[in-house]
């Protein structure tokens, strides 16, 4: 469990404006056997071209500039249906329903439980 994708394509892009959250999440994902790359904003992710090498996106909901919901909308409108998992410190039932209805594999409230994140990732990677 947790090593799904080890030895295969398992790059997760972590997008969060909080440096500490990005680094802690990256370290956690790497300890679980995933390759993780981080971005401080949705714009930085899009400008990097990393979506072509990303198996799953783990993104904050609320960020300056383009937020996680807008990123999901942008990617879907441009034909990129990458698996996405949302994390937030400010839960909102309307936002949760919107992102899940649009295909997100999870909506986790910070601080989130490692096992819940792992379940979301494994579900996303299986599709």
Where are the regions that the model predicts?
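Conserved phosphotransfer cores of two-component systems
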Residues: 48-52, 74-81, 102
């Amino acid at each position: 469990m947790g090593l799904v994708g080890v030895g295969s394509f398992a790059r997760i892009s972590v997008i969060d404006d909080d440096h500490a959250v990005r680094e802690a999440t990256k370290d956690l994902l790497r300890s679980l056997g995933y390759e993780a790359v981080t971005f401080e904003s949705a714009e930085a992710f899009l400008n990097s071209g990393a979506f072509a090498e990303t198996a799953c996106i783990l993104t904050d909901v609320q960020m300056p500039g383009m937020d996680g919901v807008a990123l999901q909308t942008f990617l879907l409108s441009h034909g990129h249906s990458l698996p996405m998992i949302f994390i937030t410190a400010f839960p909102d039932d309307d936002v949760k329903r919107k992102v899940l209805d649009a295909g997100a594999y999870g909506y986790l409230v910070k601080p989130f439980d490692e096992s819940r994140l792992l379940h979301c990732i494994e579900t996303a990677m299986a599709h």
